[in-house]
């Protein structure tokens, strides 16, 4: 089920950002993704919406995966013009959101075989614009040479891999076979990735608790 202003979108070698916003957020103590925060002296936005706003300039489409009954968050996404997709299986973990997003693309894009997937976590609002730009640029260069491409950022300081992660559509079947809360980790472990070195601590900074919010 989806709430979309556009269907049958024409896709030609496109990237769709799938913003995973249907998590339970139990450690936060309240409606985490609807909680408003301020970044860089900008007006306050719902935490879950910021990732979608940040990635939007660098991809072709953005879809936001939500719990069916999370009306407050849906309203926030709609206000900013984003498509929302209901994840009926949200209690089954992160992988269920990825699968809901891919199925939406399969059902609504005229050429889904030309569409690739950037997996974004809605609780990671501190990723910088330059990081989104770098990973998309690297992906577009690599996909011309290697159909089986996975791109993710790696932090300069400690060489830890972060988000977002872009999967070419050659991994679509494997993504649809994921289960549990590990997301695409099993695919990354099996196939490896091309890394983009970034000086951006935001690629590792998810918000699990209120104390994770930068003041």
Set out the residue ranges of the language-model regions.
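Conserved alpha/beta core of the MobA/IspD/sugar-nucleotide pyrophosphorylase nucleotidyltransferase superfamily
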Residues: 3-13, 17, 173, 177-215
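N-terminal glycine-rich phosphate-binding loop and ensuing alpha1 helix
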Residues: 12-71
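Short beta-strand segments
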Residues: 18-22, 65, 120-121, 152-155, ...
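Short, structured coil segments at secondary-structure junctions
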Residues: 58, 78-81, 189-191
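Acidic helix N-cap motif at the loop->helix transition within catalytic regions
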Residues: 71-78
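Conserved donor nucleotide-binding strand/loop of the catalytic core
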Residues: 81-92
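Conserved beta-strand segments of alpha/beta enzyme cores
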Residues: 83, 149, 192-194
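Conserved beta-loop-beta/alpha segment of the NTase-like Rossmann-fold superfamily
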Residues: 91-169, 173
